[in-house]
């Protein structure tokens, strides 16, 4: 039996951990200009350099940009990236993303230096319009001295190492199976309700407004409440009310994926699992004091046949994003590191 040295085992664990971590970062739809698409200047660099990070996420996946740190003085453009985006690679046509891609939600920011955002991310919204790209930029700027023909400094100029983030927003073939309680004609959800119109027509009717959707394996589901309403339960899609009105943890019954709980915009999304073993009904509520409750009910149905289920499942397998690999590689990296580190101490 070959006996491995501690240094050798630790070396293996370190290399595997780094390789899998790099793979993870790529699969996680992250444009990392600090460590992957580096924007550092090379010695004697005289011209600007551009690097492109192109990502093609699926709906509801998270895209992240890392631009600068406490040691890297990079600038993100626009500074409000993901709230605002550019519509072209030449940093023109600045758009508010909620107007450019209707249904956008879940922006997250992280600042490692004062008054500067270094990391941003957002979830890819359901999009019924044709596929479209959006852009943000990360820049590292430097002023250099240009020597004249005699070798003496003659002028100064700025050079820029620029990272371009190109995100292709995919297009859905059908609307999200869900309820929009803010408009009678929803651009995202399959059903729409205008609360003002309903209230005017039925001012004396105190019955709650119930919107029911029938969904199957892998279907996108969701709802949107008016801005002055609250959502019950607060963590809808993690938990929900059953038909008895009891709040239940859905993970014990129906493991939903790609959950987005955007309380700022009162918009919630999720996806049904690829396998549903039994019919299941649950609901969440938009509520406001002294107003009718707006009830979003989901009837999740077991597939009618194994053939149909297999067909839907295989179709979905092609659609599954690289984030599944991310989770696997994360565990592999961690477990590999632990095992090889342990071996280094016992061998």
Swiss-Prot record:
A lipid is attached at residue 322 (GPI-anchor amidated asparagine). Disulfide bonds join 31-53, 67-138, 81-136, 179-211, 225-286, 236-284. It is found in: Cell surface; Cell membrane. Transmembrane segments: none annotated. Residues 27-172, 175-305 form the 6-Cys domain. Keywords: Cell membrane, Disulfide bond, Glycoprotein, GPI-anchor, Lipoprotein, Malaria, Membrane, Repeat, Signal. InterPro entries: 6_CYS_dom, 6_CYS_dom_sf, Parasite_Repro/Invasion_Surf. It is a lipid-anchor; GPI-anchor. Residues 323-347 form a propeptide. Glycans are attached at residues 28, 147, 200, 228, 242, 265, 322. Pfam families: s48_45. Gene3D superfamilies: 2.60.40.2860. Its main location: other. This is Merozoite surface protein P12. It comes from Plasmodium falciparum.
């Amino acid at each position: 039996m070959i006996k491995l040295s501690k240094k050798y085992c630790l070396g293996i664990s370190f290399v595997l951990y780094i390789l899998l971590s790099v793979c993870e970062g790529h699969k996680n739809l992250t444009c990392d200009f600090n460590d992957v698409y580096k924007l550092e200047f090379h010695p004697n660099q005289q011209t600007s350099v551009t690097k492109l990070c192109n990502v093609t996420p699926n709906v509801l996946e998270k895209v992240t940009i890392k631009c600068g740190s406490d040691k890297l003085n990079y600038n993100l453009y626009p500074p409000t990236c993901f709230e605002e985006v550019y519509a072209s690679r030449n940093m023109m046509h600045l758009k508010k993303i909620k107007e450019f891609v209707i249904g956008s939600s879940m922006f997250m920011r992280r600042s490692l230096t004062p008054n500067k955002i270094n990391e941003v991310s957002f979830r890819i919204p359901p999009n019924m319009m044709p596929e479209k790209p959006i852009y943000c930029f990360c820049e590292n700027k430097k002023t250099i001295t240009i020597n004249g023909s005699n070798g003496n400094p003659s002028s100064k100029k700025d050079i820029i190492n620029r990272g371009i983030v190109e995100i292709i927003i995919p297009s859905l073939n059908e609307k999200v199976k869900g309820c929009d309680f803010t408009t009678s004609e929803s651009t995202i959800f399959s059903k729409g309700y205008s609360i003002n119109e309903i209230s005017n027509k039925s001012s004396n009717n105190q019955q709650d407004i119930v919107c029911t959707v029938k969904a199957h394996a892998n279907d996108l589901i969701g709802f949107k409440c008016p801005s002055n309403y609250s959502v019950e339960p607060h963590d809808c899609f993690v938990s929900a009310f059953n038909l008895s009105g009891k709040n239940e943890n859905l993970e014990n019954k129906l493991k939903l994926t790609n959950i987005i709980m955007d309380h700022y915009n009162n918009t919630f999304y999720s996806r049904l699992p690829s396998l549903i073993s039994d019919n299941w009904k649950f609901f969440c509520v938009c509520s406001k004091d002294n107003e009718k409750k707006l009830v979003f009910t989901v009837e999740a149905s077991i597939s009618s046949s194994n053939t149909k289920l297999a067909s839907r499942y295989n179709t979905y397998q092609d659609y599954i994003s690289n984030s599944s690999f991310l989770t696997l590689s994360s565990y592999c990296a961690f477990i590999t590191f632990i095992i090889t580190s342990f071996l280094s101490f016992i061998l």
